Design a protein with these regions (language model features):
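Soluble catalytic domains of enzymes that build or remodel membrane lipids, polysaccharides, and related
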Residues: 79-324
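Non-transmembrane, interaction-prone segments in cytosolic or luminal domains
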Residues: 14-18, 72, 133, 153-155
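Hydrophobic alpha-helical transmembrane segments in integral membrane proteins
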Residues: 43, 53-78, 97-103
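Non-catalytic terminal accessory segments
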Residues: 1-65
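Short amphipathic alpha-helical coupling elements at transmembrane boundaries
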Residues: 2-5, 32, 74, 106, ...
Length: 324
């Protein structure tokens, strides 16, 4: 059973509006007179809350379905292929029940080809236990048509193989076979060098096993990058934004994560920030002068075509080589 059913989602927003309404009511009481009388008439009838919640649910659908491109620009003194690197991050696609299904593949295809990335990095939860086989097959066929010169790289999320709520339409062998045919390299606690076309300048891609999927039983950043910082630009992929300082200390220059969805359904993001569940909930943070971390809000949505926090996005990272 999904923990966030439609009733729970509506109730959470009703509660939020009731609290906001009570705060306004206290202000109206302090002002008194006609303001208080009008507010009591509206509020006690409950009309404002129900209309507000209905409007919010309609707005949340369009917010979920509106795919944007978020661009970050970075600089490095390390050598890059041709002096620059354009990296596209796709994360938390969750095709099927969420905002993205196979009907949106033409839109994704157009958007990705317009961006013309040097490499595509998938940071987990590209599939989950809700995906139906037609969506699974259609997206893998689509991925196979993408041919960035620096390759396609993938790390597992907590949903890709660790299925929480139901038996999936695919297994590990299906995923590995489909990705092999699409020339997507799966990185599970592995570090590899990538090359953009025929340029001899390498970029290191480090892929970590998902923390939740492994319950923390995975290689440390220092084990994955035993030589520490060197002159090779290093991109580390980790589905969940954890151990960012350790990643940076071991030699990562760019850390890409997803998982948080930017909150997606209020008050999930607020609670995550209050309890510091993730080291970074959304956006970019400079961990050290030589390392930045970016957390995507997700290229899709989990479970429902609803988003009241964050945004549905493709993330483009443009890295420029500068003089030391």
């Amino acid at each position: 059973m999904d923990p966030l059913g439609p009733g729970m989602i509506v109730n959470s927003h009703l509660t939020g509006l009731y609290i906001a309404g009570d705060v306004v009511g206290l202000l109206a009481r302090a002002i008194g007179g006609t303001v208080l009388t009008v507010w009591q008439t509206i509020w006690m009838g409950g009309l404002l809350v129900w209309v507000g919640t209905a409007a919010m649910m309609v707005w949340s659908y369009f917010k979920a379905m509106h795919l944007v491109t978020t661009t970050y620009r970075l600089q490095t003194t390390k050598p890059l292929p041709g002096g620059k690197l354009r990296v596209l991050q796709i994360s938390d696609l969750h095709p099927g029940k969420g905002a993205v299904d196979r009907k949106r593949i033409p839109e994704l295809n157009r958007r990705i080809r317009e961006l013309n990335p040097d490499m595509i990095l998938f940071t987990g939860d590209i599939f989950d236990e809700h995906v139906e086989r037609p969506d699974f097959d259609s997206f893998n066929a689509f991925f196979a048509t993408l041919d960035p010169p620096g390759g396609k790289w993938f790390v597992l999320g907590n949903h890709d193989l660790f299925h929480h709520w139901r038996e999936p339409s695919y297994g590990r062998a299906d995923l590995e076979g489909a990705f092999a045919r699409a020339h997507i390299r799966i990185l599970e606690d592995v570090s590899q060098l990538a090359y953009v076309g025929k340029d001899a300048t390498p970029v290191r891609i480090v892929g970590r096993k998902d923390w939740l999927y492994t319950q923390g039983n995975r290689f440390t950043p220092a084990q994955l990058m035993p030589n520490g910082p060197d002159n090779v630009y290093t991109i580390l992929l980790d589905h969940e934004p954890r151990e960012l300082k350790a990643d940076a200390a071991a030699g990562a220059n760019l850390i890409l994560s997803g998982h948080t969805h930017g909150g997606q359904i209020w008050p999930t993001g607020l609670v995550a920030k209050l309890f510091r569940y993730n080291e970074l909930n959304y956006g970019m943070k400079q961990i050290t002068p030589a390392c930045a971390a970016i957390v995507s809000g997700g290229t899709g949505t989990w479970g429902y075509k609803i988003r009241t926090e964050g945004k549905t996005e493709l993330v483009m990272v443009e890295i420029e080589q500068k003089d030391a």
